[in-house]
C-alpha cells in the first residue's frame, strides 16, 4: 500500500517522536479556525460584557495564546517550540449565531506549527464555553480545522474553498 506514511509510527509500529534535527530551519506559519454556536441572547450577553465570569473574548484570546505555548505538554509527540508569534482573533457572527475563532502560530524552525494553531483554537473555544455556560449549556463547539500552513519540506497547504 503506497501513499502518505504516518510520521509518528516507527518501523516496529510504535509511536515515536519524529527526529527533526536534520531538517532545515524555515519560517513556518499555520492558521486554524473553529466556532462556538450559542443562543442569540448569549451572544448579546458576551457582546455587552455582561457575562458573569467577565470579559469572555479577552479571556478566551489569552487562553488560546497560552495553550499554543503549552502544546507539547498536552500532545505527547509534539516538539517543544520557540514560537515567535501567536495571535487569536475572536469575532461575533450573528448568522451562526456565536463566536468565530481564528488562530495563527509562527516560528522559524524545523517543524510545523499546525498543532499549536489548532490547540489555540480548541482552548479558546473551550474557554468561551466555560465562561458562558451559566447562561447557555446548549452551546456547540465545532469546525475546528487547519485553514493553511506554510514552510517546511511538505510545502504549503490551503484548505480548498477558503479564500484567505
Curated annotation (Swiss-Prot):
Belongs to the MoaC family. The keyword Lyase applies. Keywords: Lyase, Molybdenum cofactor biosynthesis. Catalyzes the conversion of (8S)-3',8-cyclo-7,8-dihydroguanosine 5'-triphosphate to cyclic pyranopterin monophosphate (cPMP). Homohexamer; trimer of dimers. Its EC number is 4.6.1.17. Pathway: Cofactor biosynthesis; molybdopterin biosynthesis. The active site is at residue 130. Gene3D superfamilies: Molybdopterin cofactor biosynthesis C (MoaC) domain. GO terms for molecular function: cyclic pyranopterin monophosphate synthase activity. GO terms for biological process: Mo-molybdopterin cofactor biosynthetic process. Substrate binds at residues 77-79, 115-116. Disulfide bonds: none annotated. It is an enzyme of class 4 (lyase). It catalyses: (8S)-3',8-cyclo-7,8-dihydroguanosine 5'-triphosphate = cyclic pyranopterin phosphate + diphosphate. Pfam families: MoaC. This is Cyclic pyranopterin monophosphate synthase.
Amino acid at each position: 500500500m503506497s501513499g502518505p506514511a504516518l510520521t509518528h509510527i516507527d518501523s516496529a509500529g510504535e509511536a515515536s517522536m519524529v527526529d527533526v534535527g536534520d531538517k532545515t530551519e524555515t519560517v513556518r506559519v499555520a492558521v486554524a479556525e473553529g466556532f462556538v454556536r450559542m443562543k442569540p441572547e448569549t451572544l448579546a450577553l458576551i457582546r455587552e460584557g455582561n457575562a458573569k465570569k467577565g470579559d469572555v473574548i479577552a479571556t478566551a484570546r489569552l487562553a488560546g495564546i497560552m495553550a499554543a505555548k503549552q502544546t507539547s505538554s498536552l500532545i505527547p509527540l509534539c516538539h517543544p517550540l520557540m514560537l515567535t508569534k501567536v495571535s487569536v482573533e475572536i469575532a461575533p457572527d450573528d448568522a451562526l449565531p456565536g463566536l468565530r475563532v481564528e488562530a495563527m502560530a509562527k516560528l522559524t524552525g524545523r517543524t510545523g506549527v499546525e498543532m499549536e494553531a489548532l490547540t489555540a483554537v480548541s482552548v479558546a473555544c473551550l474557554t468561551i464555553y466555560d465562561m458562558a455556560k451559566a447562561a447557555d449549556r446548549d452551546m456547540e463547539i465545532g469546525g475546528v480545522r487547519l485553514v493553511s500552513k506554510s514552510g517546511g519540506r511538505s510545502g504549503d497547504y490551503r484548505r480548498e474553498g477558503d479564500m484567505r
